[in-house]
Amino acid sequence: MNNKPIVVALDFDDKNAALQLIDRLDPQMCRLKVGKEMFTLFGPELVKDIHSRDFDLFLDLKFHDIPNTVAKAVTAAAELGVWMTNIHATGGLAMMEAAKKALVPYGKDAPLLIAVTVLTSMSDEDLKLIGIDVPAFEHVQRLARLTQQAGLDGVVCSAHEAQLLKSSLGESFKLVTPGIRPAGADKGDQHRVMTPPQAIEAGSDYLVIGRPITKAADPLAALTAIHQSLSIPG
């Protein structure tokens, strides 16, 4: 297990509130994730504010477009200096290969590039409604194999898929898992959830955790408790 597996998901419509929360966290204990809402509201300046506080950033914009457009988008993310960014595996092999190729000039400074498989909010019935008549797990496996074929660094997946994906795709293929809730926490709108220790045991490399930390009375204490549950020193 890496020593900084926790990625705190920021979901704020108030920049000052977000920065106040960030200032209560420790960059040695977690990374941060910014998604579509916050990036649309606050743009690249928010990324700079986060970097100035020494946090690694996962820019979670889930690019999905024609290959050339997605290649340019991930290049823009690399120029911002983010630690990780993502694209939709359903964009296809050519799109994913173009995105990966666009990051080659950045060498070791390139962000990790991962693909979204099946959103953790989607059930088998939800998939059927959009014409995918296989169980979520089977569809995740198919998309994950395609992602690895394209040369990407890993996928976003439910912790329930992690064990088989890790065993079939290898230790170096990173698994980023949302839908993580500490024991006793509300599941919210996530259908397929696990606790942090369960997810790590299953093979997840990075755990995306939002409200259990960001809405806690003491966010740093909540983060520390999760660290302790994972037996992470520090």
From Swiss-Prot:
Tagged with keyword Lyase: yes
EC number per UniProt: 4.1.1.23
GO process terms (BP): 'de novo' pyrimidine nucleobase biosynthetic process; 'de novo' UMP biosynthetic process
Entry's Gene Ontology cellular component terms: cytosol
Origin: domain of life: Bacteria
Enzyme class, spelled out: lyase
Classification via Gene3D superfamilies: Aldolase class I (3.20.20.70)
Known catalytic reactions: orotidine 5'-phosphate + H(+) = UMP + CO2
InterPro entries found in the cross-reference section: Aldolase_TIM, OMPdecase, OMPdecase_AS, OMPdecase_bac, OMPdeCOase_dom, RibuloseP-bd_barrel
Active site: K62
GO molecular function, one term: orotidine-5'-phosphate decarboxylase activity
Keywords recorded for this protein, A-Z: Decarboxylase, Lyase, Pyrimidine biosynthesis
Pathway(s) this gene product operates in, as recorded in its UniProt entry: Pyrimidine metabolism; UMP biosynthesis via de novo pathway; UMP from orotate: step 2/2
Binding site for substrate: 11, 33, 60-69, 120, 181, 190, 210-211
Job of this protein: Catalyzes the decarboxylation of orotidine 5'-monophosphate (OMP) to uridine 5'-monophosphate (UMP).
Family under the similarity heading: Belongs to the OMP decarboxylase family. Type 1 subfamily.
Record's protein name: Orotidine 5'-phosphate decarboxylase
Phylogenetic classification of the source organism: Bacteria, Pseudomonadati, Pseudomonadota, Gammaproteobacteria, Alteromonadales
